[in-house]
């Protein structure tokens, strides 16, 4: 989304 890093971290 806004931050690709956060998108991977939620998984």
From Swiss-Prot:
Compartments it resides in: Secreted
Q: Which GO terms describe its biological process?
A: neuropeptide signaling pathway
Where Phenylalanine amide occurs, residue numbers?
Answer: 11
Chain segments annotated as transmembrane: none
Main localization is secreted
Please provide one cellular component term from the Gene Ontology annotations of this protein. extracellular region
What is known about the tissue distribution of this protein? Detected in the thoracic perisympathetic organs in larvae, and the dorsal ganglionic sheath in adults (at protein level).
Q: Keywords in UniProt for this one?
A: Amidation, Neuropeptide, Secreted
Which family is this sequence assigned to?
A: Belongs to the FARP (FMRFamide related peptide) family.
**Entry protein name:** FMRFamide-19
């Amino acid at each position: 989304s806004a931050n690709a890093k956060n998108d991977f971290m939620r998984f």
